[in-house]
C-alpha cells in the first residue's frame, strides 16, 4: 500500500479598525492512496481525495458591552476511486457472458473469491463530491446582571455521488460441485455471483438553527 499526502495552509488576520477585525484560513489537502484490498498482488484501488477548507471570522465591537461575531466556513471534499486490475481484464475477457450493470465505460473490476486460496479484489469505481457551507452569527450583550446571547446558524450540504458497486460481478467459488474450490474455479462452476445496479444520488439539504441565552447573575452566589 502507498500513501502520498500534500497539505498547504494560509492564514490571514486584518484589523479594519479598533472595533472591527477579520481572520481567515485556507487549507488545501490532496491525498493519493493505493489500497491493496485482497491478497493477490496487482489488484488494488486508487483513491484520490482533494479537500478545500475555507474559514473566515468577522468580529465587530459595537459598544463596550456588545460584540457581534460572524463566521463563514466552506468545505469541499472530492473523492475519486478507480479499480486497478492486471491487464484491465474482466471475466468477459476470459469468455464469460456477464453484462455490466451500468452504461458507459469504466476500468475493469475484479472481485473473485476462491475459498481457501485467494481473494482477488480491486474495489469498485466511484465518485463522491461533497460541499458544505455554514453561516453563523452570534450577538453578545452584557447588560447589568444579564449576559445575553442571540445566534443563528445556517448550513447547506450538497452531495453528487455515483457508485458502480458490483457493476462487474462478485464471484465466489467454494467446494460445492467437485469438493475442491480450485477445481470449481477451473471448471467455471461458481457457488455464488452477485451484481448490483449503478447508484446515482444527488441530495441537497438545508439546516437552520436559532438560539437565545440569558446568563443572569442574581447575586454573588447564584447565577
Where in the sequence are the language-model features?
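Short acidic-glycine motifs
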Residues: 1-223
Amino acid at each position: 500500500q502507498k500513501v502520498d499526502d500534500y497539505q498547504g495552509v494560509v492564514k490571514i488576520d486584518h484589523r479594519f479598525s479598533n472595533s472591527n477585525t477579520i481572520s481567515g484560513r485556507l487549507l488545501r489537502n490532496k491525498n493519493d492512496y493505493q489500497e491493496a484490498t485482497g491478497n493477490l498482488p496487482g489488484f488494488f484501488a486508487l483513491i484520490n481525495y482533494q479537500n478545500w477548507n475555507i474559514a473566515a471570522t468577522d468580529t465587530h465591537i459595537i459598544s463596550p458591552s456588545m460584540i457581534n461575531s460572524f463566521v463563514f466556513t466552506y468545505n469541499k471534499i472530492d473523492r475519486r476511486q478507480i479499480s486497478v486490475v492486471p491487464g484491465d481484464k474482466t471475466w468477459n475477457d476470459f469468455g464469460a457472458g456477464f453484462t455490466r450493470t451500468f452504461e458507459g465505460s469504466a476500468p475493469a473490476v475484479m472481485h473473485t473469491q476462491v475459498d481457501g486460496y485467494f481473494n482477488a479484489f480491486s474495489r469498485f469505481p466511484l465518485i463522491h463530491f461533497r460541499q458544505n457551507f455554514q453561516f453563523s452569527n452570534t450577538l453578545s450583550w452584557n447588560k447589568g446582571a444579564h449576559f445575553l446571547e442571540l445566534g443563528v446558524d445556517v448550513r447547506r450540504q450538497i452531495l453528487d455521488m455515483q457508485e458502480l458497486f458490483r457493476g462487474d460481478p462478485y464471484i465466489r467459488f467454494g467446494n460445492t460441485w467437485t469438493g475442491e474450490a480450485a477445481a470449481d474455479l477451473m471448471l467455471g462452476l461458481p457457488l455464488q455471483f452477485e451484481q448490483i445496479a449503478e447508484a446515482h444520488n444527488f441530495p441537497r439539504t438545508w439546516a437552520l438553527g436559532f438560539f437565545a441565552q440569558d446568563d443572569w447573575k442574581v447575586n454573588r452566589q447564584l447565577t
